Each structure stands twice: as structure tokens, then as C-alpha cells.
Amino acid sequence: MVHPSSPPAASQQLRFVSATHNDPLAQPLLAELADEYAQRYGGTPSTHLSWLPVPQAELAAPDGGLLIGVLDGVPVTGGAFRRYDSETAELKRIWTDRAYRRRGYARVLLAALEAETAARGYRRLYLITGNRQPEAEALYDATGYTRVPADPLPSWGPFVPIAFEKWLVADRE
């Protein structure tokens, strides 16, 4: 499935494809994410890579999915979602390749994930980032996400969870 978007001028050729964690398009993004987690939080990339994949059943349609943003055949950004509760999707593994940052691709990815989850009937998005990811915090703050208390999730070593939500519909009750 290809998802059209109306990206900023720098990303006119970015297109989104549905994938799985085992997809060759997802592998370089997950490997780089594991490397960066190791740099920011400690541990080894292989340790982080062992827990990064979300169980495939949780990403299966209609409840979940993984979108990879591809530019000229190269995966540059990606993110997943899974059912959190009856009206909420949880965003997971939001990532943009280091070589493609500061070009608006993460914002375009969030817009694509928001459109896809809304089309699947979700009314709210929830996500957790870590205290050593200020770029992610800034992205979510700038794109209309609101900080909320994290559901019970213990801190792990240097990782302190920071939770965000965004309502996709204005008529929430």
C-alpha cells in the first residue's frame, strides 16, 4: 500500500509503503535505531536490536502497521502503530535515518501515520519516547502532541519514559 502525502518541498518524492520488521526496507532503519539507543542509553546495538521488533501479530492489519518512507528507493524514515485500546493506537519505532534528518521527513511520517490510524478508526494516538531523545520530544511538541503521564512503565537504567498523546478527532467525549 502506498500512502500519498503532501510533504514539504524537500520531500516531494517521499512515498510510504507498508512493511514488516523483517522487510529489507525496515532493517537499515532498525539497525541505526539500535545503534543510536546504545549511544544514548548504553548497552550494545545487538542488545537493543533484540527487543526493537514489535511482535508481528500486533502490527497486522487492521489493528497495526509499519510504514516506511522511501526516497529514490532508499528507506529514510519509518514508524509503526499497534492497538493500545479500543480508540487508541500506540506509535512505535518512529525513526529517520541520520543522513536524512532536518528535512521534514519525520513530520511527514507522523502525518502519514496519523492519516493511516484515523482511516483505521482510531481516535487517539499515544507514544512514549525517552529522556535522552530531545529531538523526538521537540518533534512531538511541535506537531500537536500533548505530554501526559506515562502508563506504568518502569524506568530502565538511564531511560526515563516521556509519554505523549494526540487526539485525531475534535469531537472527543
Model-derived regions, located:
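Loop/helix-junction capping segments adjacent to catalytic residues or to phosphate/diphosphate-binding pockets
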Residues: 24, 103, 134
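Conserved catalytic-core motifs of GNAT/GCN5-like acyltransferases
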Residues: 21, 49, 126-131, 137-163
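A generic structural signal for beta-strand entry/edge sites
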Residues: 86-88, 124, 161
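Conserved GNAT acetyl-CoA-binding A-motif
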Residues: 110, 117-129
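Acetyl-CoA-dependent GNAT
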Residues: 3, 12-92, 97-98, 110-112, ...
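Active-site acidic-Proline motif in GNAT/NAT acetyltransferases
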Residues: 97-103, 131
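Conserved G/P- and acidic residue-centered "switch" motifs that form tight phosphate/ATP-binding loops
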Residues: 73, 104, 121
